[in-house]
Amino acid sequence: MGERRGTALLAALGSTALAGLCAALFAVSAPAAEGDLLPDLGMAPIADVKVAKTTDGRRLLRFTAVIVNVGRGPFELHLRRASTSDPMAVSQRIYTSTGSREVSSAAGTVFGGDGHNHWHIVDLENSELIRLDNGAKVGTGVKLGFCFLDNTKYRLTLPGAPSSPRYGTCLTAGTQTWLDVELGLSVGWGDEYRWSLPDQYVDITNLTAGRYRLRVTADTHNLFVESNDTNNATWVDLQIKGQGSVRIDGYGPAA
C-alpha cells in the first residue's frame, strides 16, 4: 500500500497547488545581498541502494538520500495564509550579519498525502534514473513532498553549525488547520530520507538490465536563495542485473 502513496500525494496537491508548481518551474530566486548568511543546499552520498520486489510484481530501486546545508546560514522557510481556505504562501527567511529578512518563493506546498499528517514543501529534492549508454532519463523518484528538519549530523565543523538540532521535529509542520508553519535545516545538518520510507524509490519494473546513473538534486528548480547552485546534485552509477540485483560502480561528488 505504501508504494502507491505518490499518486495520493499528487491528488492532494489539487489544481491550485499544481498551478503554483508549474509557475515555480520558471521561478528565479531573489538576489542575494551583501552581508547575507546564505544556506548552501546539497546532497550527502547516496546510500542503501537496493532493489525491492512488491507483492504485485513490481521492482523498486530504493535508496537513502540526505539533503544537507553546508552554507553560512540556516535554510528556513515559512508557510503562511490568512485562513484555512487559502493556499499557503512560502517565504524564505535569510539571516544577515545584523538580523534577518524574508523573500517570497514560488515553491508549492501540500498537506499529507504520503501518510504523514503535516505540511510539506513540494520538490525540495528530485531523483532521476538515467541510462549511461545514451543519456535517456528512464525513471523519476515518486516522493514529491518534504518536511525537512535537522535529523542527521553532517558537518558540524562549519562556522555557525549548532551542536544540537535547531529544527528538530515535523510536529511544527502543523495540522491542516494551521495558518503559520516553519521548516528549517541548520548549517552543518542534514535531513535523511531512508530507503524504507513510503515513496522513497524509483520504479524500475520495465527496465532492462544495464548500467544506469541515479542522480539526486536539491532545489532542482532554483526556488530558493543559496550561496552556490553548482553543488546541488550527487549521483551513484550502478548496474541493474537480470535477476533484479544491483551493483554499485561508483559515486559522484557530494556537498
What is the predicted role of each segment?
Residues 35-39, 73-78, 135-140, 193-195, ...:
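Beta-sandwich strand segments
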